[in-house]
Amino acid sequence: LTQSAEGIDAMLSPTLIELFRYPVKSMMGESLTATEVTETGIQGDRAWAVRDERRGGIRGGKKLPQLMTLGARTGPDVPTITAPDGESAAANSDYINEWLSDKLSHPVSLWPLLPAEQLDHYRRGAPDTEDFELELRTVFGRLPDEPIPDLSGFEELLEFESPPGTYFDAFPVSIMSRQSLENMDQLDSECRFDVRRFRPNLLIDIPGSEHPFPEQLWVGATLSVGSVVLKIESTCPRCSMTTHGFADLPRDTQVMRNLVGHSEGNLGIYASVQKAGSLSINDAIEVLQRPSVARDRPNDVR
């Protein structure tokens, strides 16, 4: 057996243990006990985003880290956004753009999802520098001597902030294991590898595997969770957002140093939705189809 096949065989009853939704891109989200999942991900996840009125383009925490200090919760009609000072506003308030611009100290406007055909809405805004490598290093939080993530397979994201018609980074569902977080914590006890830094939709428990990042063994596999079927598309290359401070988490660039040093800058996996359905906490996870090509280095980005 290959390392990948052996690792999958060693997994004992993987289970969904936490479920998260982020109603506004790059803001803090909410915990769920159950949810519906469509082909575009968890219902209501990343359904809104801010547009940079100074440089253009939809913006997330990579460019506007202050976004991560705001929280968004699903309301009856639209999300309610809460600032660190306790003030809140509904996403459809007449004054929401001015309110957000004040809280972020940057001119922005808030937008629901627009149709995918409106490409200009999703096109990237002006870069901070004309030096493309420097721009990538800044976005991904990489030092000059650290490798930049391999973005082959993500070419669309060089032109657009997100796949047109969506506000997620690359794929509609992100997954992380409790074991990956615990492993990173053990490698550097000074760093807080808190799940909130990594913003997964699904946090799962994968007992039995000795792999430090067991979910990465599933890249290329098809899984069932509840009545949902997911295709695991790639590992998740991490960006500078994981290092920013918000809520009770301090700014900590050592998070990225550890990710680069121990997991090639990746943590968690991305999935597409092959069959819509519903998810609940404690749902069992089943491998329906193994990766077609065994991958002995499962934390490579494809």
List each language-model region with its residue ranges.
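Metal-cofactor-dependent catalytic cores
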Residues: 2-302
